[in-house]
């Protein structure tokens, strides 16, 4: 667990890191971050609580408790990952643990959108390829350098062509996934727009 506070920002071209494998279909958002942790006033503490109940239940042998995975940043999952409630806390918890990209068979739509909105790309692969990658990552440390533009995961031994929605790809390459930075970089346009909105005249005074 890195609890990395260097969060994604602006255009993202590449993501490098070690893979961590989490096996199981239909892993829902309540398993990713249990409901009792949603009372937090910000997301900063969520990283330590990701998969809290699963980790407690199997007492230290969860992939997120393994010392071998403490610096992992690329999560490999199975089908329908992130189903259940639409809580944005789930991708926020994963990001604060250190996850910067997810490769899976499929994702719940809202979870996918919430990931994109905070700079975590979600790639898809066929079932057998996911199983192969999970097996490799469990046997030995598996590292990838992922090219967003090429939708390609590479290392010294092999490469894997990933599936990534073209609309999402462009958001990452252009940095437009990052709404906050986009707004801050265009304050002049915002101020100009305010001049033409009569119901915001109090801001101009």
Regions found by a protein language model. Give the residues of each.
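N-terminal, positively charged, Ser/Thr/Ala/Gly-biased leader segments
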Residues: 1-35, 179-205
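Feature captures the catalytic cores and cofactor-binding loops of soluble hydro-lyases/lyases
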Residues: 2-7, 33, 40-143, 147-148
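Generic signature of intrinsically disordered, low-complexity segments enriched in small/polar residues
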Residues: 15, 40, 54, 67, ...
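Short, acidic Gly/Pro/Ser/Thr-rich loop/turn segments
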Residues: 27-29, 58, 169-170
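Acidic, glycine-rich flexible loop/linker segments
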Residues: 119-204
């Amino acid at each position: 667990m890195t609890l990395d506070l260097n969060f994604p920002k602006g255009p993202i071209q590449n993501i490098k890191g070690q893979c961590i494998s989490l096996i199981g279909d239909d892993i829902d958002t309540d398993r990713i971050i249990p409901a009792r942790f949603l009372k937090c006033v910000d997301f900063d503490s969520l990283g330590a609580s990701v998969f809290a109940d699963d980790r407690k239940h199997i007492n230290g042998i969860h992939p997120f408790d393994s010392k071998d995975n403490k610096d992992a940043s690329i999560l490999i999952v199975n089908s329908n990952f992130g189903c259940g409630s639409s809580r944005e806390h789930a991708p926020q918890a994963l990001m604060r643990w250190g996850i910067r990209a997810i490769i899976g068979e499929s994702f719940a739509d809202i979870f996918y959108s919430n990931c994109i909105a905070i700079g975590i790309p979600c790639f898809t692969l066929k079932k057998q390829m996911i199983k192969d990658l999970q097996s490799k990552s469990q046997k030995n440390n598996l590292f990838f350098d992922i090219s967003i533009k090429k939708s390609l995961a590479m290392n010294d031994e092999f490469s894997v062509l990933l599936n990534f929605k073209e609309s999402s790809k462009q958001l990452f390459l252009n940095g437009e996934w990052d709404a906050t930075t986009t707004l801050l970089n265009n304050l002049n346009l915002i101020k100009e727009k305010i001049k033409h909105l009569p119901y915001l005249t109090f801001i101009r005074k």
